[in-house]
């Protein structure tokens, strides 16, 4: 019987999902992206060679693994084809391994222009988007005026839908934001070029997943961003435009929820956030700087510096609840190696009230003071450790405390960026 695992970020994204997905795809017939777009940045390091992926699933470097992009993903054709060409330049047959849902909404130049214009207009109140058109593309999907991959292969239908779409968005660009309009003919010609390139890679993703399961092959569902950026459950409005939680693996691919057997939450040993929004455990001192330097906390997609802070067990408990987490993968443990004392947030003091669960709304969270417990650090190297018993005693105690506070077992520990720098305590595919 096929066993299917969902991998999600359990914080504000950037938890190290790409490495873990690459590691686990050794056991799978296919890996599938189910939400987000090329605002994701998944970094893989294999035998010292780094590969950064934005749209293509992180299993693409594994021979014999099919990589699927589900209907929940918003697709920027230019970004996808650029990524394909980069992989082919490294000898990876990306076109052979990749299949794309015809129902994927397209990100077009008008979406990028709108995204950037809106963010600029917000000034100091900006959300911190990547400016890649993700939000406007999802808006068009929900409003039922979006253009999908399937539309590329019907010129007259494409031209009619594109004309209507640009009439709408150009009005806003010109008369509200005072920006230049997007040229219809230029976008149409680009889309027709994309059609020729994409056609061989388009397939019914739900049917492919069913065929893999019927053949007894395991599946891996790769989430992007993180739980606390979910459009419904995150720190709204400082969130992304898609559902980033495990439930989206079903709606974003066409698989039934009963076929999702194990949910692995990827979790840094500390906390980071990029862009705007509340961050109770943020450290704006030398420890925060140390975490950023040792963790190389710069976005793989935007290059922006990430904000760093202590581990937040309150937020993680909510992520565990929303996702029904089966296990945790703790990443970047080695970043904490030099610290004498480690702090874990176990509650928020908001005025006279102590919250031990995540308060509703970003506004309330911004006014909370974190309540901590302190644990001794280990001040010795964990970099590259591959066996649990080889970790320092205090490192093991720290991980066990996280298990206790969150109520979810630690299944995997990452001790470095390379695929092999990993401790596997519980293989999700053997536990599913």
Swiss-Prot record:
The keyword Secreted does not apply. It is found in: Cytoplasm. GO terms for cellular component: cytoplasm. Mg(2+) binds at residues 14, 41. Its main location: cytoplasm. It catalyses: IMP + L-aspartate + GTP = N(6)-(1,2-dicarboxyethyl)-AMP + GDP + phosphate + 2 H(+). Pfam families: Adenylsucc_synt. Its EC number is 6.3.4.4. The active site is at residues 14, 42. Its cofactor is Mg(2+). Substrate binds at residues 300-306. The keyword Metal-binding applies. GTP binds at residues 13-19, 41-43, 306, 332-334, 414-416. Binds 1 Mg(2+) ion per subunit. Keywords: Cytoplasm, GTP-binding, Ligase, Magnesium, Metal-binding, Nucleotide-binding, Purine biosynthesis. GO terms for molecular function: adenylosuccinate synthase activity; GTP binding; magnesium ion binding. GO terms for biological process: 'de novo' AMP biosynthetic process; IMP metabolic process. Plays an important role in the de novo pathway of purine nucleotide biosynthesis. Catalyzes the first committed step in the biosynthesis of AMP from IMP. Belongs to the adenylosuccinate synthetase family. Homodimer. NCBIfam families: PRK01117.1 (NF002223), purA (TIGR00184). This is Adenylosuccinate synthetase. The lineage of its organism: Bacteria, Pseudomonadati, Pseudomonadota, Gammaproteobacteria, Chromatiales.
């Amino acid at each position: 019987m096929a066993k299917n695992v969902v991998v999600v970020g359990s914080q504000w994204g950037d938890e190290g999902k790409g490495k873990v997905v690459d590691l686990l795809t050794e056991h799978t017939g296919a890996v599938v992206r189910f939400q987000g777009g090329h605002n994701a940045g998944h970094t893989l390091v294999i035998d010292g060679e780094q590969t950064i992926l934005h749209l293509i699933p992180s299993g693409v470097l594994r021979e014999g693994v099919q990589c699927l992009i589900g209907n929940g993903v918003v697709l920027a054709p230019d970004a996808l084809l650029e990524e394909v060409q980069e992989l082919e330049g490294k000898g990876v047959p990306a076109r052979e391994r990749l299949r794309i849902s015809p129902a994927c909404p397209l990100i077009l130049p008008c979406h990028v222009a709108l995204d950037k214009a809106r963010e600029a207009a917000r000034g100091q109140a900006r959300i911190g988007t990547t400016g890649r058109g993700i939000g406007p593309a999802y808006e068009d999907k929900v409003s039922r005026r979006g253009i999908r991959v399937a539309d590329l292969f019907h010129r007259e239908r494409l031209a009619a839908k594109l004309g209507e779409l640009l009439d709408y968005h150009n009005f806003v660009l010109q008369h509200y934001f005072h920006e230049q309009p997007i040229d219809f003919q230029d976008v149409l010609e680009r889309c027709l070029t994309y059609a020729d390139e994409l056609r061989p890679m388009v397939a019914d993703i739900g049917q492919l997943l069913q065929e893999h399961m019927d053949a007894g092959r395991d599946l891996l569902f790769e989430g992007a961003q993180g739980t606390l950026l979910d459009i419904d459950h995150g720190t709204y409005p400082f969130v992304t435009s898609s559902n980033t939680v495990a439930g989206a693996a079903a709606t974003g691919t066409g698989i039934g929820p009963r076929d999702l057997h194990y949910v692995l939450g990827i979790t840094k040993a500390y906390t980071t956030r990029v862009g705007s929004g509340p961050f109770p455990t943020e450290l704006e001192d030398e420890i925060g700087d140390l975490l950023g330097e040792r963790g190389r906390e710069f976005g793989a997609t935007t290059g922006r510096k990430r904000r760093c802070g202590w581990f937040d067990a309150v937020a993680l408990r909510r992520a565990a609840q929303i996702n029904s987490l089966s296990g945790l993968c703790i990443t970047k443990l080695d970043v904490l190696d030099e610290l004498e004392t480690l702090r874990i947030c176990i509650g928020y003091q908001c005025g006279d009230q102590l919250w031990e669960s995540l308060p509703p709304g970003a506004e309330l969270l911004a006014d909370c003071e974190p309540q901590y417990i302190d644990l001794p650090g280990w001040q010795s190297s964990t970099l590259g450790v591959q066996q649990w018993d080889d970790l320092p005693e205090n490192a093991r105690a720290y991980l066990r405390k996280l298990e206790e506070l969150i109520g979810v077992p630690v299944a995997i520990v990452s001790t470095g960026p390379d695929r092999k720098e990993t401790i596997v305590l519980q293989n999700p595919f053997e536990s599913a």
